């Protein structure tokens, strides 16, 4: 069994945590909320947030580490933020950010316009790079996955939208 839940979450300067029915984390990059699970107790002690199991709860051990990891991600998100980098590989594949909309040319007969949800910003340093930033780790990853799903990297030439750190294994073509 993992012991991630034992470690306290250290609060950096400027980050404030309020515990009630909902746990609210406020920081320089915004505010995030999550529901307090009944199987764990969350307590703020100075500059630390501790998570403890409730005795007798069936899924307390599972939720203990999960709640601690989610709180740590929330604290990191409102203090430093999260970002995900995507690359476009292919002839004529381009991206352009306009406000809260990302316009993509991915070889379809029409351009693809992807609207960003609240709390997520998009930048295009070059025409083939997309940088997704936000304070909610789950939301940043979800938006990146949605954009990648428009044109996943294909296995023969590697064309498509890929994560910057993704390794695409190229298959060899069939020989007679």
Curated annotation (Swiss-Prot):
* RNA-binding among keywords: yes
A molecular function (GO) term: rRNA binding
SUPFAM superfamilies linked to this entry: Ribosomal protein L6
| KW ATP-binding (keyword) present | no
The alphabetical list of record keywords is: Ribonucleoprotein, Ribosomal protein, RNA-binding, rRNA-binding
State the Gene Ontology BP annotations. Answer: cytoplasmic translation
InterPro entries the UniProt entry points to = Ribosomal_uL6-like, Ribosomal_uL6-like_a/b-dom_sf, Ribosomal_uL6_a/b-dom, Ribosomal_uL6_bac-type, Ribosomal_uL6_CS
Q: Name one GO cellular component term.
A: cytosolic large ribosomal subunit
Subunit description: Part of the 50S ribosomal subunit.
Q: Summarize the protein's role.
A: This protein binds to the 23S rRNA, and is important in its secondary structure. It is located near the subunit interface in the base of the L7/L12 stalk, and near the tRNA binding site of the peptidyltransferase center.
Query: What family classification does the UniProt entry report for this protein?
Result: Belongs to the universal ribosomal protein uL6 family.
Q: Which PANTHER family match?
A: 60S/50S RIBOSOMAL PROTEIN L6/L9, LARGE RIBOSOMAL SUBUNIT PROTEIN UL6M
Protein name according to UniProt:
Large ribosomal subunit protein uL6
Record organism: Dechloromonas aromatica (strain RCB)
Taxonomic classification: Bacteria, Pseudomonadati, Pseudomonadota, Betaproteobacteria, Rhodocyclales
Gene transcribed to yield this protein: rplF
